[in-house]
A protein has these predicted regions:
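Short amphipathic alpha-helix that is part of the acyltransferase structural core
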Residues: 1-19
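Short hydrophobic/aromatic beta-strand element in the GNAT-like acyltransferase core
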Residues: 26-31, 40, 129-131
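Conserved beta-strand in the GNAT
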Residues: 35-45
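Conserved acetyl-CoA binding element of GNAT-fold acetyltransferases
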Residues: 48-60
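Glycine-centered recognition micro-motifs in short, flexible terminal segments and loops
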Residues: 59-71
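Conserved GNAT acetyl-CoA-binding A-motif
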Residues: 78-98
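Conserved catalytic-core motifs of GNAT/GCN5-like acyltransferases
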Residues: 97, 115-130
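Conserved active-site alpha-helix within GNAT-family acetyltransferase domains
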Residues: 101-118
């Protein structure tokens, strides 16, 4: 498996999730096998402290490696922002919004460590939208900071 970054990953995620937009200029990090994307994460609406995350896969679980999970959390929590001096910084939290009827995705984000924050009643074609959050200091996939990696 290999990492893939770019607009193609974002478009693949949009096609898998049925999202009504193409996520604009957002960043996507994918996991590919034999040149075909099997999983991806798109990061949207970064505002300096929070970023939204959209996750999709081909339905398999072979992509769920520690390496990939560390990468998809390291980027938003340690690298997404760039200060005027060129140093990178990350989000304090990630937000994920899932349709209530998507039981697999709801179970998946909970297993990753996201916490249910709120419910948007009748906000999705399948019913309610469930809003999940994860704070940087609660992410179990961040074993070392980005700065520690650079110093090593």
């Amino acid at each position: 498996l290999s990492l893939v970054v770019g607009k193609g990953v974002v478009e693949w995620i949009a096609s898998r999730t049925g999202e009504f937009n193409c996520f604009g200029t957002d960043v996507g990090i994918g996991w590919a096998k034999h040149g075909k994307i099997v999983a991806g994460v798109a990061y949207a609406n970064w505002n300096g402290v929070n970023v939204e995350c959209h996750i999709a896969s081909d339905g398999s679980r072979r992509w769920l490696t520690r390496e990939y999970l560390t990468t998809i959390f390291d980027y938003p929590f340690n690298q997404i922002g760039i200060r005027p001096d060129g140093t990178r910084y990350g989000a304090n939290r990630i937000t994920v919004v899932v349709g209530e009827g998507n039981t697999d995705s709801n179970r998946f984000v909970k297993n990753l460590g996201f916490e249910l924050e709120s419910r948007l009643e009748a906000a999705h074609p399948t019913g309610d939208l469930l809003v999940y959050r994860m704070f940087r200091d609660r992410c179990r996939f961040l074993q070392v900071t980005h700065e520690q990696k650079l110093a090593a």
